[in-house]
């Protein structure tokens, strides 16, 4: 036993990164700042080399990592407990990993369902042809483009001009 749940599970599942294995796991439990002593590459340099990212957030007000992933044309799996996942669910014509982002429903009580959803999505993605993956990457980048500030600022203006000012709030007491 290694005293690390991730490494123990990888060993239990027989995921040993053998040459014949179709899935390779890179597990680096540290911040990728280019000086980690393992990969010595910055996070964004590593992200560019990924086929698919998985961020099964339990709670994030927004969730920048899946957005960063799709901004770099890397399809991603996230959950609806991240603001980004909720936002993606609100998009029209967004139907899962084939459109660049798979959003899984997550709660306090569905750990196994989320794990199965991740497994199933990775398995589905691994069957895609190079041409299909190229198209999925393009769609992932299109999702990221919709999250640019030039599209979101309108909502901030709406809040700014429709919310009561602090002065108005004091008067209503």
Show where each model-derived region lies.
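Nucleotide-activated donor-binding/catalytic signature segment of Leloir-type glycosyltransferases, i.e.
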Residues: 1-45, 101
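A structural signal for short secondary-structure junctions
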Residues: 19, 46-48, 70, 96-97
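Acidic donor-binding loop of glycosyltransferase active sites
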Residues: 44-61
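Catalytic binding pocket for nucleotide-activated donors in carbohydrate/polymer assembly enzymes
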Residues: 56-135, 142-144
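Short, amphipathic alpha-helical "lid/cap" segments that border enzyme active or binding sites
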Residues: 115-119, 150-157
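C-terminal alpha-helix
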Residues: 124, 155-159, 163
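Single conserved hydrophobic/aromatic residue that forms the stacking wall/gate
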Residues: 161-173
């Amino acid at each position: 036993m290694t005293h690390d749940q991730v490494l123990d599970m990888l060993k239990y599942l027989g995921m040993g990164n053998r040459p014949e294995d179709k899935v390779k796991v890179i597990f680096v439990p540290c911040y990728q700042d280019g000086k980690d002593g393992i990969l010595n590459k910055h996070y964004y340099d590593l992200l560019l080399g990924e086929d698919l990212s998985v961020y099964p957030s339990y709670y994030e007000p927004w969730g920048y990592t899946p957005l960063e992933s799709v901004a770099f044309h890397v399809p991603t799996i996230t959950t609806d407990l991240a603001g980004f996942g909720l936002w993606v669910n609100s998009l029209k014509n967004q139907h899962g990993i084939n459109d660049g982002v798979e959003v899984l429903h997550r709660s306090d009580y569905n750990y196994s369902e989320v794990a199965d959803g991740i497994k199933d999505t990775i398995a589905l993605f691994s069957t895609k042809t190079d041409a299909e993956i190229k198209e999925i990457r393009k769609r992932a980048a299109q999702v990221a483009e919709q999250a640019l500030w030039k599209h979101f600022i309108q909502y901030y203006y709406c809040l700014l001009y429709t919310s009561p000012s602090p002065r108005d709030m004091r008067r209503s007491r």
